[in-house]
Protein backbone atom coordinates (compact mmCIF):
# COMPACT_ATOMS: atom_id res chain seq x y z
CA UNK A 1 0.00 0.00 0.00
CA UNK A 2 1.22 3.50 -0.81
CA UNK A 3 2.94 5.40 2.02
CA UNK A 4 1.75 8.99 2.53
CA UNK A 5 4.92 9.86 4.43
CA UNK A 6 7.33 8.44 1.86
CA UNK A 7 5.29 9.97 -0.98
CA UNK A 8 5.57 13.39 0.71
CA UNK A 9 9.26 13.23 1.61
CA UNK A 10 10.61 14.30 -1.82
CA UNK A 11 8.35 17.37 -1.69
CA UNK A 12 9.65 18.27 1.78
CA UNK A 13 13.26 17.88 0.63
CA UNK A 14 12.52 20.04 -2.42
CA UNK A 15 11.15 22.76 -0.13
CA UNK A 16 14.28 22.56 2.02
CA UNK A 17 16.53 22.89 -1.03
CA UNK A 18 14.53 25.85 -2.38
CA UNK A 19 13.82 27.60 0.92
CA UNK A 20 15.12 31.01 -0.23
CA UNK A 21 13.12 30.86 -3.44
CA UNK A 22 9.97 29.86 -1.52
CA UNK A 23 10.39 32.54 1.18
CA UNK A 24 10.47 29.94 3.95
CA UNK A 25 13.03 29.13 6.65
CA UNK A 26 14.51 25.76 7.59
CA UNK A 27 15.42 25.24 11.25
CA UNK A 28 17.34 22.23 12.58
CA UNK A 29 16.40 21.54 16.18
CA UNK A 30 18.99 20.31 18.69
CA UNK A 31 17.44 16.84 18.77
CA UNK A 32 17.80 16.47 15.00
CA UNK A 33 14.22 17.22 13.95
CA UNK A 34 13.61 19.65 11.09
CA UNK A 35 11.17 22.57 11.22
CA UNK A 36 10.02 24.38 8.08
CA UNK A 37 8.70 27.84 8.95
CA UNK A 38 6.24 28.66 6.18
CA UNK A 39 4.72 31.81 7.64
CA UNK A 40 5.50 32.47 11.32
CA UNK A 41 8.63 34.61 10.88
CA UNK A 42 8.67 34.62 7.07
CA UNK A 43 6.34 35.74 4.28
CA UNK A 44 5.95 32.42 2.51
CA UNK A 45 4.70 32.26 -1.07
CA UNK A 46 2.01 30.82 -3.34
CA UNK A 47 4.42 28.07 -4.36
CA UNK A 48 5.15 27.20 -0.74
CA UNK A 49 1.40 27.07 -0.11
CA UNK A 50 0.95 24.74 -3.06
CA UNK A 51 3.68 22.38 -1.83
CA UNK A 52 2.45 22.57 1.78
CA UNK A 53 -1.02 21.57 0.57
CA UNK A 54 0.38 18.70 -1.49
CA UNK A 55 2.23 17.43 1.59
CA UNK A 56 -0.96 17.70 3.66
CA UNK A 57 -2.52 15.41 1.04
CA UNK A 58 0.22 12.84 1.51
CA UNK A 59 1.81 13.58 -1.85
CA UNK A 60 -1.17 11.85 -3.47
CA UNK A 61 -2.72 14.83 -5.25
CA UNK A 62 -2.00 17.41 -7.90
CA UNK A 63 -2.27 20.95 -6.54
CA UNK A 64 -2.31 24.09 -8.66
CA UNK A 65 -2.96 27.80 -8.22
CA UNK A 66 -4.72 29.97 -10.77
CA UNK A 67 -6.39 33.35 -11.13
CA UNK A 68 -8.80 31.85 -13.68
CA UNK A 69 -11.88 29.74 -13.11
CA UNK A 70 -12.97 31.84 -10.16
CA UNK A 71 -16.42 33.00 -9.16
CA UNK A 72 -17.42 35.73 -11.59
CA UNK A 73 -16.06 38.93 -13.12
CA UNK A 74 -17.31 40.94 -10.15
CA UNK A 75 -15.11 39.12 -7.65
CA UNK A 76 -11.73 37.89 -8.78
CA UNK A 77 -9.67 35.86 -6.33
CA UNK A 78 -6.77 33.45 -6.83
CA UNK A 79 -7.91 29.84 -6.54
CA UNK A 80 -6.36 26.57 -5.46
CA UNK A 81 -7.16 23.46 -7.49
CA UNK A 82 -6.88 19.90 -6.18
CA UNK A 83 -7.10 16.58 -8.04
CA UNK A 84 -6.53 13.15 -6.51
CA UNK A 85 -6.83 9.50 -7.52
CA UNK A 86 -6.65 8.45 -3.84
CA UNK A 87 -9.46 10.51 -2.25
CA UNK A 88 -10.00 8.59 0.99
CA UNK A 89 -6.33 8.18 1.87
CA UNK A 90 -5.19 11.61 0.67
CA UNK A 91 -7.97 13.63 2.31
CA UNK A 92 -8.94 11.64 5.41
CA UNK A 93 -5.81 9.54 5.87
CA UNK A 94 -3.54 12.57 5.59
CA UNK A 95 -5.08 16.03 5.07
CA UNK A 96 -7.79 15.95 7.73
CA UNK A 97 -6.86 18.15 10.71
CA UNK A 98 -7.37 15.24 13.07
CA UNK A 99 -4.49 15.69 15.52
CA UNK A 100 -4.66 18.33 18.27
CA UNK A 101 -0.99 18.67 19.16
CA UNK A 102 -0.67 19.94 22.74
CA UNK A 103 2.72 19.89 24.46
CA UNK A 104 3.16 22.16 27.48
CA UNK A 105 2.04 25.61 26.39
CA UNK A 106 2.33 24.77 22.70
CA UNK A 107 -0.81 23.99 20.71
CA UNK A 108 -1.38 23.39 17.01
CA UNK A 109 -3.83 21.61 14.75
CA UNK A 110 -1.94 18.80 13.08
CA UNK A 111 -2.64 17.38 9.65
CA UNK A 112 -0.71 15.52 7.02
CA UNK A 113 1.10 12.19 6.67
CA UNK A 114 2.33 11.70 10.26
CA UNK A 115 -1.26 11.19 11.38
CA UNK A 116 -1.25 7.85 9.57
CA UNK A 117 1.63 6.68 11.78
CA UNK A 118 0.15 7.93 15.05
CA UNK A 119 -3.35 6.82 14.00
CA UNK A 120 -4.89 10.17 14.92
CA UNK A 121 -7.75 9.51 15.23
CA UNK A 122 -7.75 5.72 15.17
CA UNK A 123 -11.41 5.41 14.12
CA UNK A 124 -10.76 7.25 10.84
CA UNK A 125 -8.06 4.78 9.81
CA UNK A 126 -10.24 1.84 10.75
CA UNK A 127 -13.03 3.21 8.56
CA UNK A 128 -10.82 3.78 5.51
CA UNK A 129 -8.70 0.68 6.26
CA UNK A 130 -5.35 2.43 6.01
CA UNK A 131 -2.18 2.72 8.05
CA UNK A 132 1.34 3.86 7.18
CA UNK A 133 4.49 2.17 8.48
CA UNK A 134 7.18 4.53 7.18
CA UNK A 135 10.28 5.39 9.22
CA UNK A 136 9.84 9.12 8.61
CA UNK A 137 7.11 11.38 10.05
CA UNK A 138 5.91 14.55 8.30
CA UNK A 139 3.40 16.70 10.16
CA UNK A 140 1.80 19.97 9.04
CA UNK A 141 0.94 22.35 11.86
CA UNK A 142 -1.50 25.25 11.77
CA UNK A 143 -0.02 27.52 14.44
CA UNK A 144 1.32 31.02 15.03
CA UNK A 145 4.38 29.77 16.95
CA UNK A 146 7.17 27.41 15.98
CA UNK A 147 7.48 24.04 17.76
CA UNK A 148 10.49 23.17 19.92
CA UNK A 149 12.36 19.97 20.72
CA UNK A 150 9.67 18.81 23.15
CA UNK A 151 7.05 18.96 20.41
CA UNK A 152 9.30 17.07 18.00
CA UNK A 153 10.03 14.41 20.65
CA UNK A 154 6.29 14.02 21.26
CA UNK A 155 5.57 13.56 17.54
CA UNK A 156 8.44 11.07 17.18
CA UNK A 157 7.17 9.03 20.14
CA UNK A 158 3.57 9.00 18.87
CA UNK A 159 4.69 8.02 15.36
CA UNK A 160 7.28 5.44 16.43
CA UNK A 161 10.16 7.01 14.51
CA UNK A 162 13.54 8.47 15.43
CA UNK A 163 13.26 12.19 16.16
CA UNK A 164 15.86 12.91 13.47
CA UNK A 165 13.29 11.64 10.96
CA UNK A 166 10.63 14.15 12.06
CA UNK A 167 9.73 17.07 9.78
CA UNK A 168 7.37 19.75 11.09
CA UNK A 169 5.92 22.28 8.63
CA UNK A 170 4.30 25.31 10.24
CA UNK A 171 1.97 27.97 8.81
CA UNK A 172 -0.31 30.38 10.71
CA UNK A 173 -3.89 30.85 9.55
CA UNK A 174 -3.03 34.51 8.86
CA UNK A 175 -0.42 33.78 6.20
CA UNK A 176 -0.46 33.10 2.48
CA UNK A 177 0.58 29.47 3.01
CA UNK A 178 -2.12 29.08 5.67
CA UNK A 179 -4.75 30.59 3.38
CA UNK A 180 -3.77 28.34 0.47
CA UNK A 181 -3.70 25.12 2.48
CA UNK A 182 -7.10 25.75 4.07
CA UNK A 183 -8.75 26.43 0.70
CA UNK A 184 -6.89 23.34 -0.49
CA UNK A 185 -9.16 21.32 1.82
CA UNK A 186 -12.09 21.81 -0.54
CA UNK A 187 -12.22 18.13 -1.57
CA UNK A 188 -11.56 16.96 2.00
CA UNK A 189 -14.51 18.98 3.32
CA UNK A 190 -16.74 16.82 1.13
CA UNK A 191 -15.20 13.45 2.02
CA UNK A 192 -15.17 14.45 5.70
CA UNK A 193 -18.90 15.18 5.61
CA UNK A 194 -19.60 11.99 3.66
CA UNK A 195 -17.95 9.92 6.38
CA UNK A 196 -18.55 11.86 9.59
CA UNK A 197 -22.04 13.28 9.05
CA UNK A 198 -23.64 11.11 6.34
CA UNK A 199 -21.88 7.81 7.17
CA UNK A 200 -21.13 7.06 3.53
CA UNK A 201 -18.28 4.66 2.72
CA UNK A 202 -15.68 7.04 1.28
CA UNK A 203 -13.71 4.12 -0.16
CA UNK A 204 -16.30 4.18 -2.95
CA UNK A 205 -14.99 7.61 -3.99
CA UNK A 206 -12.48 6.67 -6.69
CA UNK A 207 -11.43 10.11 -8.00
CA UNK A 208 -12.04 13.65 -6.81
CA UNK A 209 -11.32 17.22 -7.86
CA UNK A 210 -12.09 20.62 -6.41
CA UNK A 211 -11.41 24.34 -6.66
CA UNK A 212 -11.79 27.10 -4.08
CA UNK A 213 -10.82 30.78 -3.86
CA UNK A 214 -7.90 31.71 -1.60
CA UNK A 215 -8.67 34.20 1.16
CA UNK A 216 -6.76 37.49 1.12
CA UNK A 217 -4.88 38.27 4.34
CA UNK A 218 -7.49 40.45 6.06
CA UNK A 219 -6.48 40.31 9.72
CA UNK A 220 -5.34 38.14 12.61
CA UNK A 221 -5.70 34.38 12.96
CA UNK A 222 -9.30 34.61 14.24
CA UNK A 223 -10.49 36.80 11.36
CA UNK A 224 -8.59 34.62 8.90
CA UNK A 225 -10.14 31.48 10.34
CA UNK A 226 -13.52 32.89 9.38
CA UNK A 227 -12.43 34.05 5.94
CA UNK A 228 -10.56 30.85 5.02
CA UNK A 229 -13.49 28.64 5.98
CA UNK A 230 -15.87 30.82 3.99
CA UNK A 231 -13.78 30.32 0.85
CA UNK A 232 -14.72 26.63 0.86
CA UNK A 233 -18.22 26.86 2.36
CA UNK A 234 -19.39 29.57 -0.05
CA UNK A 235 -16.90 29.38 -2.91
CA UNK A 236 -15.71 25.77 -3.12
CA UNK A 237 -16.73 23.54 -6.02
CA UNK A 238 -16.09 19.80 -6.04
CA UNK A 239 -16.45 16.81 -8.35
CA UNK A 240 -16.51 13.22 -7.04
CA UNK A 241 -16.39 10.00 -9.08
CA UNK A 242 -18.18 7.39 -6.98
CA UNK A 243 -18.60 3.68 -7.70
CA UNK A 244 -21.90 3.08 -5.93
CA UNK A 245 -23.55 -0.10 -4.74
CA UNK A 246 -27.15 -0.88 -5.67
CA UNK A 247 -28.47 0.29 -2.31
CA UNK A 248 -26.76 3.69 -2.43
CA UNK A 249 -28.91 6.77 -2.99
CA UNK A 250 -26.42 9.00 -4.79
CA UNK A 251 -28.96 11.74 -5.45
CA UNK A 252 -29.74 12.00 -1.73
CA UNK A 253 -26.02 12.02 -0.96
CA UNK A 254 -25.42 14.84 -3.43
CA UNK A 255 -28.31 16.87 -2.05
CA UNK A 256 -27.08 16.47 1.54
CA UNK A 257 -23.42 17.23 0.89
CA UNK A 258 -23.12 20.97 0.08
CA UNK A 259 -22.90 23.58 2.83
CA UNK A 260 -26.36 24.93 1.88
CA UNK A 261 -27.89 21.93 3.68
CA UNK A 262 -26.73 23.28 7.05
CA UNK A 263 -29.09 25.27 9.31
CA UNK A 264 -26.47 28.00 9.71
CA UNK A 265 -26.02 28.50 5.96
CA UNK A 266 -26.00 32.09 4.77
CA UNK A 267 -23.88 33.57 7.57
CA UNK A 268 -20.12 34.14 7.44
CA UNK A 269 -18.35 31.44 9.42
CA UNK A 270 -17.00 33.87 12.02
CA UNK A 271 -20.57 34.90 12.91
CA UNK A 272 -21.55 31.26 13.36
CA UNK A 273 -18.44 30.63 15.46
CA UNK A 274 -19.25 33.57 17.75
CA UNK A 275 -22.86 32.39 18.13
CA UNK A 276 -21.48 28.99 19.19
CA UNK A 277 -19.40 30.71 21.91
CA UNK A 278 -16.26 29.89 19.95
CA UNK A 279 -16.85 26.16 20.39
CA UNK A 280 -16.37 24.15 17.18
CA UNK A 281 -18.29 21.23 18.64
CA UNK A 282 -21.47 23.34 18.88
CA UNK A 283 -21.44 24.09 15.15
CA UNK A 284 -23.58 22.01 12.78
CA UNK A 285 -21.20 19.48 11.19
CA UNK A 286 -23.12 19.91 7.96
CA UNK A 287 -21.67 23.39 7.54
CA UNK A 288 -18.16 22.06 6.92
CA UNK A 289 -18.67 21.29 3.24
CA UNK A 290 -18.04 22.76 -0.21
CA UNK A 291 -20.59 25.11 -1.76
CA UNK A 292 -21.17 22.97 -4.86
CA UNK A 293 -21.02 19.18 -5.19
CA UNK A 294 -21.18 17.24 -8.45
CA UNK A 295 -21.16 13.44 -8.43
CA UNK A 296 -20.56 11.09 -11.33
CA UNK A 297 -21.88 7.64 -10.43
CA UNK A 298 -19.51 5.25 -12.20
CA UNK A 299 -21.92 2.32 -11.83
CA UNK A 300 -25.00 3.97 -13.35
CA UNK A 301 -23.40 6.72 -15.42
CA UNK A 302 -25.59 9.34 -13.76
CA UNK A 303 -24.31 12.87 -13.19
CA UNK A 304 -25.94 14.94 -10.42
CA UNK A 305 -25.10 18.30 -8.89
CA UNK A 306 -26.36 20.44 -6.01
CA UNK A 307 -25.49 23.74 -4.37
CA UNK A 308 -24.34 27.19 -5.45
CA UNK A 309 -21.51 29.57 -4.75
CA UNK A 310 -22.56 32.56 -2.67
CA UNK A 311 -20.66 35.68 -3.63
CA UNK A 312 -22.70 37.94 -1.33
CA UNK A 313 -21.53 36.05 1.77
CA UNK A 314 -17.95 35.98 0.51
CA UNK A 315 -17.98 39.75 0.02
CA UNK A 316 -19.43 40.24 3.50
CA UNK A 317 -16.84 37.93 5.01
CA UNK A 318 -13.94 39.76 3.36
CA UNK A 319 -15.46 43.25 3.68
CA UNK A 320 -14.87 43.38 -0.06
CA UNK A 321 -14.94 47.00 -1.29
CA UNK A 322 -15.44 48.07 -4.89
CA UNK A 323 -13.98 51.51 -5.64
Curated annotation (Swiss-Prot):
Its main location: cytoplasm. Catalyzes the reversible interconversion of 5-formyl-H(4)MPT to methenyl-H(4)MPT(+). GO terms for biological process: methanogenesis, from carbon dioxide; one-carbon metabolic process. One of its GO terms (molecular function) is methenyltetrahydromethanopterin cyclohydrolase activity. Belongs to the MCH family. It is found in: Cytoplasm. GO terms for cellular component: cytoplasm. Gene3D superfamilies: Methenyltetrahydromethanopterin Cyclohydrolase, Chain A, domain 1 (3.10.340.11), Methenyltetrahydromethanopterin Cyclohydrolase, Chain A, domain 2 (3.30.1030.10). This is Methenyltetrahydromethanopterin cyclohydrolase. It catalyses: 5,10-methenyl-5,6,7,8-tetrahydromethanopterin + H2O = N(5)-formyl-5,6,7,8-tetrahydromethanopterin + H(+).
Amino acid sequence: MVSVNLSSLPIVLDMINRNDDLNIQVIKLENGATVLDCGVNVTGSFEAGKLFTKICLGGLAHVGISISGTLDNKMVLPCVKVKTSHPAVATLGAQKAGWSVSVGKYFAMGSGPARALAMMPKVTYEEIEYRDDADVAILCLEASKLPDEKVADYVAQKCGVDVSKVYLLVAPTASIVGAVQISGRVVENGTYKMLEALHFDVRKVKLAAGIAPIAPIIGDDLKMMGATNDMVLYGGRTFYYIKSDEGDDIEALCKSLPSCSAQTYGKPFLEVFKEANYDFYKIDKGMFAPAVVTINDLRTGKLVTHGNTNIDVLKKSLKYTEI
